[in-house]
């Protein structure tokens, strides 16, 4: 059975959901991606960030410079190799990310609570579990 219509609808709905989350964010997408990576992985070099994000090192250097100017990241010497500099999320950057996540979670919680009944919430949970299986490797 051809699942193309389901795949297309899923892609559209997920894209709409992502756009809705981005509405509550003041940080541009490239900077947000870097902050998310730093929250997950901890301090890393600009070249490592570029490789992880799939961008040129020059582009990443520009993004990191913007984050440094905004006070959202800090730069430190690598204790293992003093020739390299590590980029680390700052306390302000961490606060911004936590606040964004809190706002996004509150919006989703409110939408689920007010727009879905108990049975629909169970169905949504089952759907999330299925979607997770689609992306788990």
Where would I find each of the regions flagged by the language model?
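Short amphipathic alpha-helical/adjacent loop interface patches that line ligand
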Residues: 14, 53, 97, 128
């Amino acid at each position: 059975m051809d699942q193309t219509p389901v795949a297309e609808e899923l892609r559209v709905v997920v894209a709409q959901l992502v756009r809705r989350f981005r509405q509550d964010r003041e940080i541009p997408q490239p900077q947000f991606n870097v902050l998310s990576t730093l929250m997950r992985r901890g301090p890393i070099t600009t070249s490592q960030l570029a490789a992880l994000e799939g961008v040129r090192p020059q582009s990443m250097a520009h993004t990191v410079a913007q984050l440094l100017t905004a006070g959202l990241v800090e730069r430190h010497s690598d204790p293992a190799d003093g020739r390299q500099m590590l980029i680390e999320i700052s306390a302000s950057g961490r606060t911004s990310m936590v606040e964004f996540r809190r706002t996004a979670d509150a919006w989703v919680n409110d939408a689920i609570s007010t727009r879905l009944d108990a049975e629909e919430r169970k169905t949504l949970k089952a759907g999330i579990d299925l979607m997770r299986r689609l992306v788990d490797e």
